[in-house]
């Protein structure tokens, strides 16, 4: 008989994180309006190889679909959940291709269930509306089990970004240096260091505050699927796993024709941003 992928439906508190191999789950978050659930896809991979180093690998969490109209992260994370082979890996990888499943289904930035932007809902609230409960799940059950957090974004229908990995200014020099090293592994043309004052409640804000090696990024725009952006996100995550000895193979350079390393762009202060002075067509 052909191999079949079995997906288990469970509550957040029932999610088993330590099962060897690759397991697919749909994590159920109850709806506020009726007896029903929003099912968040979660893949947990515990590698079957022994770690190549004395210390254990840090564990990596990868998120797509934090905003539902940003598709590159959803595609890359889903492909990784299918393609990563635990026989070639050690350590733990957690993949969530559609963190805000309801906004992904609606192809919009905010959840139609509660009107909340998932990337403004952290640290979450276990008794809040569904977006806040999902954020609380990430903070209390996902973050404690990993040391590296990757949140893959794109411009949706409102922003035109060059393909870039990104992170916030970090006060701790050791954490900042390691984040910069990991950001380069996506081999994007640019790495953006952007102001943490632009918004609050971000997934990456919470991960950074907890000392995680935290990477964001913008891998497309215009509510399409940018093939090059998907490639950088997909191969970038694999490069991160190779960097920490969690996946066999050598780090891959995604643009061999480019002789230089990714260019760092700093926009760390509010004065680096120019808001539109009035509504209109620009």
Where are these regions (language model features)?
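Structured catalytic-domain cores with a bias toward divalent-metal coordination
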Residues: 1-282
């Amino acid at each position: 008989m052909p191999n079949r992928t079995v997906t288990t439906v469970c509550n957040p508190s029932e999610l088993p994180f330590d099962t060897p191999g690759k397991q697919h789950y749909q994590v159920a978050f109850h709806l506020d309006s009726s007896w029903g659930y929003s099912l968040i896809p979660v893949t947990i991979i515990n590698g079957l190889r022994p770690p190549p180093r004395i210390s254990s690998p840090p564990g990596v969490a990868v998120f797509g679909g934090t905003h539902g109209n940003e598709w590159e992260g959803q595609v890359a994370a889903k492909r990784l959940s299918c393609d990563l082979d635990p026989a070639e890996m050690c350590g733990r990888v957690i993949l969530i291709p559609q963190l805000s499943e309801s906004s992904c289904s609606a192809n919009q930035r905010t959840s139609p269930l509660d009107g909340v932007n998932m990337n403004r809902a952290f640290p979450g609230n276990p008794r809040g509306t569904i977006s806040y409960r999902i954020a609380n799940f990430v903070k209390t059950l996902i973050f404690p089990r990993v040391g590296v957090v990757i949140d893959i974004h794109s411009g949706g229908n409102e922003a035109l970004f060059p393909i870039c990995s990104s992170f916030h200014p970090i006060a701790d020099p050791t954490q900042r240096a390691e984040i910069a090293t990991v950001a380069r592994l996506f081999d994007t043309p640019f790495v953006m260091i952007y102001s943490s004052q632009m918004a609050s409640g971000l997934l990456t804000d919470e991960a950074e505050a907890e000392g995680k090696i935290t990477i964001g990024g913008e891998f497309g725009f215009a509510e399409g699927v940018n093939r090059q952006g998907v490639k950088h996100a997909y191969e970038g995550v694999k490069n991160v796993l190779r960097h920490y000895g969690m996946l066999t193979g050598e780090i891959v350079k995604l643009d061999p024709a480019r002789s230089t390393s990714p260019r760092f762009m700093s926009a760390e202060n509010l004065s680096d941003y120019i808001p539109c002075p009035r509504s209109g067509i620009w």
